[in-house]
């Protein structure tokens, strides 16, 4: 049986899950590298589960639960009182002893939590992660540089204002980011299927974060991360999906009643996976990890989907075949019962849905696969992969490139009405303020660091606490824009609602690469507010003067002074222009750009 929202509806104790995770790592008996990687995942899962637990309590409007008070001493006292009321004699003594043991365990875990918050500890853990997860020396170097920057920023915050002149402004920005309803930190993407060979991660339902995203509530994001020389077990989903390879190479096979299609996929390739099609993916590369990012559109329940595995692993109920009674299976498969039992028992010896495979088997699975450009057409065909790299860039200059695959040109994308785009912003450059006419864009940070600023009329000025307002309240606040901002790093996700002006910048030391899914992408128009091709320049003279209450010449001096289009450097190229006290500065004040 597939898993999706079970943990959200019936949350388990994060500490107990952490203990089980550590026990699982010890049982594996793998080498030191695998043990370290497993332990790091346990620690990350604990931190994420604790944050999720706090978020659930915050949404329910209760900071303190009377049945389970947060204060450890109150919990201990409550435990002792329950022992007095409900136990007698020897049972009461054992009950009190368990209360004491629980208090000691919580104290040890609090101490470990304090260690995890220590910047030095975080820095060493970050460095270990780089050594384990990144294969190439160049990626390891970039990862370690990010660790160093984060460590220095943390030190600057703790040293006080004298060591960080911009500390107060940075603090406000970090507070805003924590409450940003459109931003999802990489650590908030939960692992649903995890083993030593990889994991499948789901982003929470968009409406779990905020009702502002109810327009895309029937879409989900899933990320596959697989080690070299691995295969994912065959399965199908009750969801349409579009998948993009963001790292490594893959061979993906689709099986339906009439057809079987295999495709070799490179980084930047896009493929549609129809609902109900049995699919399996292999990573036959011996060195590089595989990462695939998928946008799903469930077909049964809005925002909810399941994965259905024919072959189970670890847990007997993971295979849908196991739920059928023996007499049904014996008759349907024409196979004796004892042979079926051996068949199912053999599957339970594996751990997880991503498994290691021999080079011989992997070569056999990929030898008849087609590549992008070889597109089969049939009633149940996926249409084959699309290579974003082979598309001509929609926007390009020395500061960045933007590629896109449109539903108008690719039949594979029409059913979900999704446009897929890939942007690379060079270090120290910006994709200028722009907005989408009808598409809401879900963006995944493939690589690099940067930040974005977005103008939004739906959030309040107080740490975005008004994000769930009713429609009437939203209408009353029309025209009152607030800046929504976040710092971006690899693995983060953010959403750009239709009509919202946004600017995205890359950091000074590395390029920023972004993958975008434009929902309602057919015939979407992208309008730019700066650069040579901005829409302000197309306004009539009288419209400009009436709008900005200034002479046309001064307005045009501002909007025509940028020599580049779409992507520009963040450093000023010209000495022309005015300071913030110039009257025309109000043009961009509405969006805080």
Curated annotation (Swiss-Prot):
- Chain intervals with Basic and acidic residues compositional bias: 46-76, 97-118, 150-178
- Amino-acid positions noted as binding Cu cation in the UniProt annotation, renumbered to this chain: 182, 456, 458, 500
Instruction: Briefly state the modifications made to the protein after translation.
Output: Proteolytically cleaved.
User: Which terms does the record give in the GO molecular function aspect?
Assistant: copper ion binding; nutrient reservoir activity
Q: List every stretch annotated IgE-binding.
A: 49-58, 76-85, 101-110, 463-470, 541-555
According to the record, the residues making up region (Disordered) are: 46-123, 150-184
What's in the keyword line of the UniProt record? Allergen, Coiled coil, Copper, Glycoprotein, Metal-binding, Seed storage protein, Storage protein
* Presence of the UniProt keyword Magnesium in the record: no
State one Pfam family annotation.
Cupin_1
Q: So which residues have sugars stuck on them?
A: 229
Its tissue distribution reads:
Expressed in seed (at protein level).
Q: Where is this region: T-cell epitope?
A: 175-193, 206-225, 246-265, 302-321, 318-337, 382-401, 414-433, 438-457, 478-497, 542-561, 558-577
Q: Which InterPro entries does the record match to this protein? A: Cupin_1, RmlC-like_jellyroll, RmlC_Cupin_sf, Seed_Storage-Functional, Vicilin_N
Per the record, the coiled-coil ranges are 529-556
Please state which protein family the record places this protein in: Belongs to the 7S seed storage protein family.
Q: What is the annotated role of this protein in its UniProt record?
A: Seed storage protein.
Protein's name according to its UniProt entry: Vicilin Jug r 2.0101
